[in-house]
Amino acid sequence: MASFTTTSSSSLLLKTLLPVSHLNRFSTLSGIRVGDSWTPLLRNISTAGSRRRVAIVKAATVDSDYSSKRSNSNEQRETIMLPGCDYNHWLIVMEFPKDPAPSRDQMIDTYLNTLATVLGSMEEAKKNMYAFSTTTYTGFQCTIDEETSEKFKGLPGVLWVLPDSYIDVKNKDYGGDKYINGEIIPCTYPTYQPKQRNNTKYQSKRYERKRDGPPPPEQRKPRQEPAASDSS
């Protein structure tokens, strides 16, 4: 398990933000703010595990006013332990054009080609990519060392290079759709299902909607005259 020291330096901020999984545990990191001053990169989504990953992938730098105040102070830095961070599992966040937006297959091909550029072959890329996403976030996860991770910087479409960490600590799961030697296994995070309303007690109160307009005229039966008696 790795330890990470927060800092106001924008070059170290991306590595300090890290994996995208523990914002629910740390609402604020020393020197890092999550609030209106951030420019959101990704949208929130419904699954709990992915929400944690998306939440911390927020922005590249803090606002300059806050950073300058931080750099001029002697505030002590905080060290945060993140389960799963070992500098051998990395999250590569990428961006894609919106118009026209690429298909899922095209995004996966881009992930593999980007990793192949770093590792030297498509075969190695397929061996080392272990997960990815094209929906809740746009990026892939791969097993490489820290020195190799530096080679992603400056490649087309690459936004951030972040050490990965568990989104499910109990099951040691890094999240995303699994990618095992070319085989894709979609993630199966539980989603919230609202309880269905019990309408049994309302069934007796159902009624039919009346037609618009005035009520139809009342129809009366003709009055029957009493039968005349025969005269004797």
Swiss-Prot record:
Pfam families: MORF_dom. The keyword Plastid applies. Residues 190-232 are annotated as: Disordered. GO terms for cellular component: chloroplast; chloroplast envelope; chloroplast stroma. Residues 190-202 have a biased composition (Polar residues). Keywords: Chloroplast, mRNA processing, Plastid, Transit peptide. It comes from the Eukaryota. InterPro entries: MORF/ORRM1/DAG-like, MORF/ORRM1/DAG-like_MORF, S8pro/Inhibitor_I9_sf. GO terms for biological process: chloroplast RNA modification; cytidine to uridine editing; mRNA processing. Disruption phenotype: White leaves with green islands, giving a variegated appearance. Mutant plants can grow autotrophically on soil. Residues 1-58 form a transit peptide. It is found in: Plastid, Chloroplast. Residues 205-224 have a biased composition (Basic and acidic residues). GO terms for molecular function: mRNA binding; protein dimerization activity; protein homodimerization activity. Involved in organellar RNA editing. Required for the processing of multiple editing sites in plastids. Belongs to the MORF family. Homodimer and heterodimer with MORF2. Interacts with protoporphyrinogen oxidase 1 PPOX1. Heterodimer with MORF5/RIP5. Interacts with PCMP-A2/PMD1. Interacts with ORRM6. This is Multiple organellar RNA editing factor 9, chloroplastic. It comes from Arabidopsis thaliana (Mouse-ear cress). The gene is MORF9.
